[in-house]
Amino acid sequence: MIRVAINGYGRIGRSILRALYESGKRQQIQIVAINELAKPEAIVHLTQYDTTHGRFQPRVKLVDDQMLIGDDVIKILHEPDPAKLPWHEMDIDIVYEATGAILDRNSCEAHIHAGAKQVLISHPSSADVDGTIVYGVNQDLLRAEHTVVSNASCTTNCIVPVIDVLDKHFGVKSGAITTIHSAMNDQQVIDAYHDDLRRTRAAGQSIIPVDTKLARGIERILPHMKDKFEAISVRVPTINVTAIDLSVTLDKTVDIATVNQVLELAANGRFNGILGYTDEPLVSCDFNHDPRSSIVDGTQTRVSAGQLVKLLLWCDNEWGFANRMLDTSLAMIAAKQS
């Protein structure tokens, strides 16, 4: 049994816990502790009730400083300094670092010094970590000696499997990406101050351009794609699910049917459970709570002049990513034991 702790119990931290119980991986992974500065009553309440993902079915209650989920006992901690966390005493194998604030190797090593054996960051990280993993594409790079690993971003997990398939079958010359991302909690409900002037504006009233490093994230997973992609991102007034508009120029001449067939075969084969394919007339809310990293919308595939291909990809930017956190952590343990 893998003993894990969650540091930071926000949108991703809570999704990881819920996904663990819904995915069937609870027999492999046990959440021993949650470190979160919020009040225990709020931690338990937001575990039970979620506007986006609905009510959590297992019985949850608070007893002293512990959250009980059925027969499982999870210690609630409120320690702002990761170096002071009791990971050694708790025999923690992996910390899911989900604060969004601890992103480099030096900061994550506070967990290691506190006694955790490994750290998995739920965010793109600095280049000094042992590896950045998009599960389904490059988890084979994990090694026993790796202690600090990044799970990349939700959008990197969404787009990289598709680029990988296209490149292996047709060759990718270059690409341009627009991420159409649901609002996030670094935005304002009503106009308020923020260092990013666009993010001073009410999230529910505008389509808001934001910076993105998605193109650089692709390069980290697929180094041969260096300087081939650029990306922009906009936030839109929905609370979950993201769409990606991907345009790529291919080496080979293709048509819509060929592109869709290759992607559908990949979704049913090598990337089963990671990549999806649909030709139904769906909208964003239909992909809420979808555990896959990416779903290709075959109805929106377009080809211009035989080599310029436009695709529409969907992902649940919370739930899909949380499920990949579980998968990557299991792969880390498998590599450590090999």
Curated annotation (Swiss-Prot):
Pathway connected to this protein: Cofactor biosynthesis; pyridoxine 5'-phosphate biosynthesis; pyridoxine 5'-phosphate from D-erythrose 4-phosphate: step 1/5
UniProt-listed Enzyme Commission number(s): 1.2.1.72
One GO CC term, this protein: cytoplasm
Localization: Cytoplasm
CDD domains: GAPDH_C_E4PDH, GAPDH_N_E4PDH
Site positions per UniProt: Activates thiol group during catalysis: H181
InterPro entries from the UniProt entry: E4P_DH_bac (IPR006422), GlycerAld/Erythrose_P_DH (IPR020831), GlycerAld_3-P_DH_AS (IPR020830), GlycerAld_3-P_DH_cat (IPR020829), GlycerAld_3-P_DH_NAD(P)-bd (IPR020828), NAD(P)-bd_dom_sf (IPR036291)
Catalysed reaction equations from the record: D-erythrose 4-phosphate + NAD(+) + H2O = 4-phospho-D-erythronate + NADH + 2 H(+)
Binding site for NAD(+): R11, I12, N317
UniProt-annotated catalytic positions: C154
Function (record text): Catalyzes the NAD-dependent conversion of D-erythrose 4-phosphate to 4-phosphoerythronate.
Family indicated by similarity: Belongs to the glyceraldehyde-3-phosphate dehydrogenase family. Epd subfamily.
Protein name: D-erythrose-4-phosphate dehydrogenase
Organism phylogeny: Bacteria, Pseudomonadati, Pseudomonadota, Gammaproteobacteria, Alteromonadales
